């Protein structure tokens, strides 16, 4: 389920997640629309290793400097039961943004991953690909590949984290992204801090230099007022160089400040 908003639902009712599923001793099998394995959203996401998550602007692990796959339509997802802390996941989409064309002309998403959670350790490894078959002519794009790895170790008050992404697309981005972050219990809430660095190539810009560099830092604070309501504040700064130096987008070059309240229904 989910609200019908432009930012998350693409103008449709229940655009965040809408699925039919069966669950039992064999695991969980679902069909419908949901977030991908690395999306940070929905019932099947298993992303770990980045304290600031995917909901704080330029500090989001899924921001535009990296490679991410958000939500998919026509999806099939399966998650195994947990075996001593290890859970395996697989996901496929027959059409990431609809199913209006025949199979060979739809975008297809493929994802497989593993998550381990036991005692103080939480970690995940995810491989994903989108074949971009629904693009044509001069706009035709090559298959995108991404691998995400995350590791967290809970020390009690402080949970340090490490995240890494490898991404590759012919005639697109070929990048490595690293993130160091931490979650700290402070004043009845949680402080989230993180820094990222990305380097690689991007064939998309028109500039002659296809090398790219980007880094950002961010900090957020979440204070719960109740089980469903929390106050949130965030500040972040981003800077890029090489082919992205003049990119006029806050995710690449700029800063953000947020203050607000979240309520879950």
Each language-model region and where it sits:
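Outer-membrane beta-barrel "beta-signal"
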Residues: 223, 252-265
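Short coil turns and loop connectors of transmembrane beta-barrels in diderm outer membranes
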Residues: 25-26, 84-85, 119-120, 156-157, ...
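Outer-membrane beta-barrel pore domains and translocons
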Residues: 1, 34-36, 91-95, 117, ...
């Amino acid at each position: 389920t989910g609200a019908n908003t432009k930012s998350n639902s693409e103008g449709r009712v229940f655009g965040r997640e809408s699925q039919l599923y069966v669950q039992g001793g064999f695991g969980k099998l679902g069909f419908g629309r949901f977030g991908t394995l690395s999306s940070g959203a929905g019932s099947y996401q298993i992303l770990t290793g980045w304290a600031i998550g995917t909901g704080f602007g330029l500090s989001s692990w899924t921001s535009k400097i990296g490679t991410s796959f958000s939500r998919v339509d026509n999806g099939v997802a399966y998650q195994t039961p947990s075996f001593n802390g290890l859970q395996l996941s697989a996901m496929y989409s027959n059409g990431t943004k609809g199913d209006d064309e025949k199979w060979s002309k739809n975008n297809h998403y493929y994802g497989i991953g593993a998550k381990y959670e036991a005692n103080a350790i939480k970690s995940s490894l995810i491989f994903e690909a989108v074949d971009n078959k629904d693009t044509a002519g001069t706009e035709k794009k090559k298959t995108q590949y991404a691998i995400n790895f995350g590791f967290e170790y809970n020390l009690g008050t402080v949970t340090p984290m490490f995240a890494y992404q490898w991404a590759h697309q012919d005639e697109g981005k070929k990048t490595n992204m690293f993130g160091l972050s931490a979650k700290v219990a402070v004043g009845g809430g949680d402080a989230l801090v993180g820094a990222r660095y990305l380097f690689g190539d991007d064939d998309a810009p028109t500039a002659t230099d296809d090398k790219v560099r980007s880094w950002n830092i961010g900090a957020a604070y979440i204070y719960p007022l109740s089980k469903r309501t929390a106050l949130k504040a965030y500040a972040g700064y981003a800077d890029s160089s090489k082919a992205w130096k003049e990119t006029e987008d806050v995710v690449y070059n700029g800063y953000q400040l947020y203050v607000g309240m979240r309520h879950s229904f």
